[in-house]
Amino acid sequence: MKTDPLADLERLANLKEKIRNAHIEYMIAISVRKVAYSKIIQESESTSNEIITELALRNAQYELMETLNSEDFERHKAMFQAHNHNWAVRELTALRNCFAGALFVDLDNLIKGLSSIVNKQCAEANIGIEPVKHKQAGRAITNNVRLGAAIWAAGNNFRHFENWPGTPDVQPERTAIGSINILRDLLDFECFNWNVCGEVLALIAKGRSVEQLFEDFQQIGRDLCDVPLQTLDKHTERLLIQVKSEGLVNEEHQKMLAANSI
């Protein structure tokens, strides 16, 4: 499902706050979850099967509880409470990963829009994140993975992870190889058939706040704007000057990015 990630930049801030709450506090009210489910399904390019599966399992558990008489319920109450806690943790983990994935899809599309405007690849932005240090011999990482590349790989993972190979023995599709390699280097485990966006978000925010991700992302935007203005048309030149002086969030720039988003 094609989405317009730039229709409302305020949505990114709201989504960021939900991610932060789910990831750090690990608790979201049932009423908020219902909104979150519909929001993710509408705004992401993923089918969000993780969330749907966990929700179905929990609903089945509640239906079973309702069929028990009071004596059976009391006898199995402790067991149900334990199961309920486990399902809640699993559901919130899936929710956190899907929220993180939706964020990466938005950021990836926005970076692509910026890149198309200034005719410069986002991978050239001189911003990196420190990968996990590999323990295996011969797999030491010497260079940081660029933040733009990590966002791109995580966005692709969320969009298409269900179509990636289920085991390392199966050769992935050509379009997935680059993303899988980046995520493997970042996380130090095989990233096949799994949504790892929550782990990528935690890695990027390690030792810092999640807000730092947005500061780094805005720096990518500033770097992308740092190109010779004589190579741009007059309208884009005026927009970039305005962006540099006022920041990324202004109505005219949003429309320009939305028109050029991929």
Regions found by a protein language model. Name each.
Residues 90-100, 104-118, 122, 126:
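Eukaryote-skewed repeat-based solenoidal scaffolds used as protein-protein interaction platforms
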Residues 114-134, 166-171:
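Short acidic alpha-helical/loop segments enriched in Asp/Glu that coordinate divalent cations
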Residues 1-57, 63-97, 134-262:
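Acidic, Ser/Thr/Gly/Pro-rich intrinsically disordered interaction regions
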